[in-house]
């Protein structure tokens, strides 16, 4: 990945994390085991295995606590992010590749440098048009990803 693209990606992730955690400040996870759950402080990519997440899709969980989770998702060309809903707020940053995203009734082609905001409980999914990587940020964390 080009140095300039990587810097832009890291900057965007910081903005996304700030925005998501700030927007959900009044919706804190109640005192529960999830609230006390957290990842290691440093997650080193080459030390973290990719987990299967569907045909042609794999993910790495890159950090989390009860309030927020950062996930890197790798897609092969033609892979489908099956349409689904969840109660989490989601923001997605396109690191590389090209995707056709559907969010609610809207459909748009997105590519490196683009972002997507997905409200809770909105049907969304994607088709990978060119191999790529997405970075998803969820608030609160996706406890179902830890099982």
Place the predicted regions along the sequence by residue.
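Short, conserved beta-strand element in jelly-roll/cupin
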Residues: 74-76, 85-101
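A cytosolic small-molecule/anion-sensing beta-strand core signal
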Residues: 95-96, 111-112, 130
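Short acidic-glycine-tyrosine-enriched beta hairpin
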Residues: 106-120
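Bacterial N-terminal signal peptides that target proteins for export
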Residues: 2-11
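Ligand-binding loop in jelly-roll beta-barrel domains
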Residues: 120-144
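Conserved short histidine dyad/triad with adjacent acidic residue
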Residues: 54, 69-85
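A short, N-terminal "cap"/entry segment at the start of jelly-roll beta-barrel domains
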Residues: 23-67, 147
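Bacterial N-terminal signal peptides
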Residues: 11-21
């Amino acid at each position: 990945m080009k140095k300039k693209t990587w810097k832009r990606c890291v900057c965007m992730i910081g903005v996304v994390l700030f925005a998501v955690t700030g927007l959900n400040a009044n919706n804190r996870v109640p005192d529960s085991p999830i609230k006390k759950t957290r990842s290691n402080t440093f997650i080193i990519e080459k030390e973290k295995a990719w987990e299967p997440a569907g045909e042609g899709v794999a993910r790495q969980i890159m950090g989390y606590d009860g309030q927020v989770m950062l996930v890197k998702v790798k897609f092969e060309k033609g892979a489908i992010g099956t349409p689904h809903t969840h109660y989490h707020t989601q923001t997605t940053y396109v690191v590389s590749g090209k995707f056709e995203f559907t969010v609610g009734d809207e459909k748009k082609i997105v590519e490196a440098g683009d972002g997507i905001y997905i409200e809770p409980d909105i049907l969304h999914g994607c088709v990978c048009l060119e191999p790529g990587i997405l970075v998803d940020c969820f608030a609160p964390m996706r406890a179902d990803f830890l099982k």
